[in-house]
Amino acid sequence: MGTTWSVQYVSATRADLHALHDAIQARLDVVVAQMSTWQTDADIMRFNRASAGDWFALQDDFLQVLTTALEVASASDGAFDPTLSPLVAAWGFGAHAEVRGRPAPADLVAARARVGWCYLQLDSEHHRVRQPGGVMLDLSAIAKGYGVDVVARLLRGRGIEAALIEVGGELYGYGRKADGTSWRVLVESSPDEEADSEGLEPRVLALDGLAVATSG
């Protein structure tokens, strides 16, 4: 997903840190291999290159995230759209962006013509999605949060009672720290944002069974 991760945890039993690190990395590698737009051989990029009319087989993580993404797209009437990749790139963001800046009107028209979550045909029963032709998926707005969720499930499965998990600015905290307090994170503006505006007033958020997305 073109980013980093970190985990802080509390456990009554001693864990093998190297084994735990490797297990977390391996689980996230599975997510990355399916949904990272930063890897040309990832499943999502192979779907984006598929020919019009092709049915593309989905592995479990990809299917779950895409299903949720399409549900949110429908519920938000397209305010959330996992097919926005051409527009994201046109404005200079994402893994395949060129120079950041205002795109030419003709480029925006061309990009918009390839955007539309409703063009996708998802066959959940057979774990596949149909490429309508030229549609490019980008699940960056949801895949990192999913990565946090799968790490949390892994830690709980290993008996870890409390943890703060962060993947590229998406955080989830559960349980309490050794001193009995909740996990706390500081949210503040980046230096670039502060230079351009008044910025965001710093806030401390307590996370106990709660998540927060701070990126982008």
Annotate each language-model stretch with its function:
Residues M1-G216:
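Mature catalytic core of soluble alpha/beta enzymes
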